[in-house]
């Protein structure tokens, strides 16, 4: 059984990155093959940010971004990049775990996020869905 973990770990947010890390480690301890689904609504720029988000803060937060990217690279098993819902049909696991950071966020900026983070992309697949 292979499990895909879906959350917003690509945001440079401590809670989201640690949630992905903790769920992945727990599944590892249970002997369950898993990886974090690296879904984003649009391709990240060279700094690991969604283009045009917080431009004024980018210069002052480069070290923070670098540290998040290093942590993800060294401590998370990530799938290949899936960018936008046009690639969502390619995502295939036996089970999906949805992180609480995606369930409880009050903001949905893109329809792509709702499509992904409410399991719309896999509703017709026989996989188990856990949130």
Task: Tell what function each PLM region has.
Residues 5-14, 18-131:
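Aromatic- and Gly/Pro-rich donor/ligand-binding loops
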